[in-house]
Amino acid sequence: MLAVPDAPAAAAWYRDALGAEELWNLGSVIGLSIAGAPVFLGEPSNNGWDYPARLGMPSVRVEVFCDDPDAFIGRAVAAGATGRTYPVRLHDMPWGPHRQGSFADPFGHLWFVGDRSPLQQFVPPK
């Protein structure tokens, strides 16, 4: 779950910037699908966790894999992603060549976006 100060506002940003689809909405807790993966947003309320702006640093690193990481990051940057924004570049990894870049969303969460997941080898074919 990503801690955010205002779950409805964050859900709107993720929808507009990352193409998120809302799965369900309880007000302060919202379920989304981003790049085919379920993501939960929640507003902390003095229960032992907090969002990055109050912590003063990122509290999570989100990894997303998609067909076009350049476009995914481009949409995020155009919608206001700032901070640790790095363009997509090629990485030589044990599972093969992998293109990856990153950005920080307006809520302080660090996102890494790549084109090839090392976990893909474990996913059964459809």
Label for each model-derived stretch:
Residues 1, 11-104, 114-126:
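Vicinal oxygen chelate
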Residues 2-6:
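Short, surface-exposed ligand-recognition loops at beta-strand->loop->(often short) alpha-helix junctions
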